[in-house]
Curated annotation (Swiss-Prot):
Organism: Sinorhizobium medicae (strain WSM419)
Name of the protein described by the UniProt record: UDP-N-acetylmuramate--L-alanine ligase
Gene responsible for this protein: murC
Compartments, as annotated in UniProt: Cytoplasm
Principal location class: cytoplasm
Residues annotated to bind ATP: 114-120
Annotated pathway: Cell wall biogenesis; peptidoglycan biosynthesis
Length: 471
């Protein structure tokens, strides 16, 4: 049974979150009554208000009003006053992924999973379905630049969603097509072991119906290992690997544009389809790989090669994925969400491919627990940066861990052989340092999942003020 329209007023606790806001927006567009609360004003809160959704700032029991259904994310603590009030009223409390699953039942669904690259790949799949005239509904974990939002209601029969594996609830999503970009040891606080992470992703793919299929990256060792274990489900592989069903090759760069060819091989018939000279307006092998995942989905849905090429060429990117925030003295300043060593390494490698000058990486580590568990990986992920500026850890509410901090990481990076790694005290120290070292042609790349995005937005103006020029 599909979710009826008569469920009553739906209240989102933490409605401004990137995942929650998208679900709230689509529910609203479907005709449901929606309201919510959040701790602070934000762009997402403002956008939802403009659509007519009532939002309270601060969490108070009275915010519930006449709500009959409560939606929460894993970020909401058990002592939240609205959650306590909801349970006292015996109201149904629904996890974010459960509500997303209900929305997916209205459409044929494509779920994009993986430790890294989900948001960009979700956006690319949506772009190719758009180019093919399929007009999908989209719920993403980041702002899609072409839409100006992370969610969009389409008139077509397909829905494209980002599947968040962090708390295991992605296994509730009723996907017809499941994409896995990679599998790394993340979220071990929830899973307990890497083997449990592996098992969850295998189940994610095997959950698709017999008429669906999985799309798996053959370049990632963990995913390739999983391919051979998938039972009784169709699998399409992709990547640079010569054995992949959908293979990218012949990559070259034109400034910040990646040019590449794709070869699609049908296992049963032996048919080979080639799409040459695809132009993706983003640098980086990882972005070409994500685009190839989108091609693997699109070609199976019957989208023509010329529409695929057009969709890739017009792809507008995702906010906080190598987003240009401004220029100063010929140096370009970028904002990126990368906060895991694998992501940081990929972003800096892409920057190196596109940049004619030097790379200045500014990183704000996100969570003491992540820095502690991946400390050695962090020491080697900045190799493509000529200069590294490390800010204090963004705690995200965690307690500090003795010996786990940015100063210790700087020392370890230097000991591992990096020529120029420095610690900065915070945002106020950033612009003066960058003003001294950035030169025309350089890229200054700010990386992290915390408040560093605001630093990236402010930095061009701060640099202009230092130099006495107007931005």
């Amino acid at each position: 049974m599909k979710m009826p329209k008569t469920i009553g007023l739906v209240h989102f606790i933490g409605i401004g979150g990137i995942g929650m806001s998208g679900i709230a927006e689509v529910l609203h567009n479907l005709g449901h009554r929606v309201q919510g609360s959040d701790q602070a004003e934000s762009a997402n809160v403002q956008r939802l208000r403009e659509k007519g959704i009532r939002i309270s700032i601060g969490h108070k029991a009275e915010n519930l009003g006449d709500a009959e259904v409560i939606v929460v994310s894993t970020a909401i603590k058990k002592d939240n006053p609205e959650l306590i009030a909801a349970r006292e009223k015996f109201l149904p409390v629904v996890r974010r992924a459960e509500m997303l699953a209900e929305l997916m039942r209205f459409r044929n669904a494509i779920a994009i999973g993986g430790t890294h690259g989900k948001t960009t790949t979700t956006s690319m799949v949506a772009a190719l379905l758009d180019a093919g005239g399929l007009d999908p509904t989209v719920i993403n974990g980041g702002i899609i630049n072409a839409y100006g939002t992370n969610a969009r209601m389409g008139a077509g029969e397909w829905m494209v969603v980002e599947a968040d594996e962090s708390d295991g609830t992605f296994l509730k999503l009723p996907a017809d097509i499941a994409v896995v970009t990679n599998i790394d040891p993340e979220h071990l606080d929830h899973y307990g072991s890497f083997d449990a992470v592996r098992s969850a992703f295998r189940q994610f793919v095997e959950n698709v119906p017999f008429y669906g299929f999985g799309v798996l990256c053959l370049d990632h060792p963990e995913v390739q290992s999983m391919v051979g274990k998938i039972e009784d489900r169709k699998v399409v592989t992709y990547g640079e690997n010569p054995q992949a069903d959908v293979r990218f090759h012949n990559i070259r760069m034109d400034g910040a544009t990646s040019i590449f060819d794709i070869e699609i091989r049908r296992r049963r018939t032996g048919q080979v389809i080639e799409i040459k000279d695809l132009r993706l307006p983003m640098p980086g092998r990882h972005n070409v790989s994500n685009a190839t995942a989108a091609v693997a989905v699109a070609q199976r849905l019957g989208i023509k090669p010329e529409d695929i090429a057009r969709g890739i060429a017009s792809f507008g990117g995702v906010k906080r994925r190598f987003t240009l925030t401004g220029e100063w003295n010929g140096a370009r300043i970028f904002d990126d969400y990368g906060h895991h060593p694998v992501e940081i390494k990929a972003v800096l490698r892409a920057a190196r491919e596109a940049c004619q000058g030097r790379i200045v990486a500014v990183h704000q580590p996100h969570r003491y627990s992540r820095l502690s568990s991946l400390f050695e990986d962090f020491t080697s992920c900045f190799n493509d940066a000529d200069t590294i500026l490390l800010a204090p850890v963004y705690s995200a509410g965690e307690e500090a861990i003795d010996g786990v901090n940015s100063e210790a990481l700087v020392n370890r990076i230097k000991a591992a052989g990096h020529r120029d790694a420095r610690h900065i005290s915070g945002q106020e120290a950033l612009a003066p340092v960058v003003a001294k070292i950035a030169q025309p042609g350089d890229f200054v790349v700010l990386l992290g999942a915390g408040s560093i995005t605001y630093w990236a937005a402010a930095l061009p103006k701060q640099l202009a003020e230092i130099s006495g020029n107007r931005a």
